[in-house]
Structures are given as C-alpha cells and as structure tokens.
Amino acid sequence: MDIDPYKEFGASVELLSFLPSDFFPSVRDLLDTASALYREALESPEHCSPHHTALRQATLCWGELMNLATWVGSNLADPASRDLVVNYVNVNMGLKFRQLLWFHISCLTFGRETVLEYLVSFGVWIRTPPAYRPPNAPILSTLPETTVVRRRGRSPRRRTPSPRRRRSQSPRRRRSKSRESQC
C-alpha cells in the first residue's frame, strides 16, 4: 500500500523530498518546538485541526519507536547488529519523522498555503541550474512578504491615483506631511 501522509494537506512526499535532509531540525528540537507553541491544543481533548491531530499521532509513534529502540539496545547482544538497527532508525525513520513534524508545525505556524508555496518555490529553485538561479534559497519566514500569488478568478487590484499636491501650502508644511506619511 502506497500511503502519502501529506496528500490530504495538498503536499506530497516527493515535494518534501526537495528539501535536503540536513534542512530539518532534530526530532527532539521539533518536539520541543511543538510543545512550546501548541502544548495546550495538543493536550486538549478537543479537535483543533488536522495538523494538531497529525502532530499528536507523530509524537505518539515517535515515543513507541523510541521504546522499541531502547528494547533493541538492551536485548540485542551483538554490537554490530545493534549499531545497524540504531543507524537505520536514525537515518530512515528519523528523517521521515523530522519531515512530518516540520511540515505540520510549519503549517500551524505559517499557514498551509504559505508552506505549500515555499515547497514549490524551493523545488523550483533547487532544480534550476546554479548559473540561472539566485544565490540564496527561498526562506519560509519571509515568503509571505515577498511572494505574489494570483488566484484564478480574481481581478487585479485597482490602483488608486496618487494624491495631488496642493499648491497653496507652504514648503515647510508639505515637508512635515511627507514625514508623517513615512512612518
């Protein structure tokens, strides 16, 4: 069965795979962030959002995986085998959890649309040959300020004419008004 945990959120495993593995913070840091920002909502018996539910599930699954890792560490006598299991969990499963936690925390923090726009813009940036792309990758926290997305069906905003300067005002008065408008 091919299950994509991001499908219902408009994303995909492939879209997140454009971000390099070292982009994602550690699971511990992500869990601490989720707890610091959303503890009340995550511990609430109320349903808050699908992102909260996904974070709850990921947190519970990570806890169970750590219990299994502890059991393996205690019960697997061969150090080489133990290292292989620990390495597999950290590299493969750890990355999947880091991606999952990052995605849902980011959606709650910045909004799902912003995160999806970021993933698409990063994917375009990373696939563009270095000679033709800007030197710096897009940054999620600045995306809402710099991204212009035109939705279908919306007419462009009308431009309002600039205010006309009244000739009867003295230059001193005009300067003070321009200072006010800069603030």
Swiss-Prot record:
SUPFAM superfamilies: Hepatitis B viral capsid (hbcag) (SSF47852). Residues 155-176 are annotated as: 3 X 7 AA repeats of S-P-R-R-R-[PR]-S. Residues 136-183 are annotated as: Disordered. Sequence repeats lie at residues 155-160, 162-168, 170-176. Phosphorylated by host SRPK1, SRPK2, and maybe protein kinase C or GAPDH. Phosphorylation is critical for pregenomic RNA packaging. Protein kinase C phosphorylation is stimulated by HBx protein and may play a role in transport of the viral genome to the nucleus at the late step during the viral replication cycle. The modification Phosphoserine is found at S155, S162, S170. Pfam families: Hepatitis_core. The keyword Magnesium does not apply. A motif (Bipartite nuclear localization signal) lies at residues 158-175. Homodimerizes, then multimerizes. Interacts with cytosol exposed regions of viral L glycoprotein present in the reticulum-to-Golgi compartment. Interacts with human FLNB. Phosphorylated form interacts with host importin alpha; this interaction depends on the exposure of the NLS, which itself depends upon genome maturation and/or phosphorylation of the capsid protein. Interacts with host NUP153. InterPro entries: Hepatitis_core, Viral_capsid_core_dom_sf_HBV. One of its GO terms (cellular component) is host cell cytoplasm. Keywords: Capsid protein, Cytoplasmic inwards viral transport, DNA-binding, Host cytoplasm, Host-virus interaction, Microtubular inwards viral transport, Phosphoprotein, Repeat, RNA-binding, T=4 icosahedral capsid protein, Viral penetration into host nucleus, Virion, Virus entry into host cell. Residues 149-177 have a biased composition (Basic residues). The keyword Ion transport does not apply. Its main location: virion. Gene3D superfamilies: Viral capsid, core domain supefamily, Hepatitis B virus. This is Capsid protein. Residues 177-183 are annotated as: RNA binding. One of its GO terms (molecular function) is RNA binding.
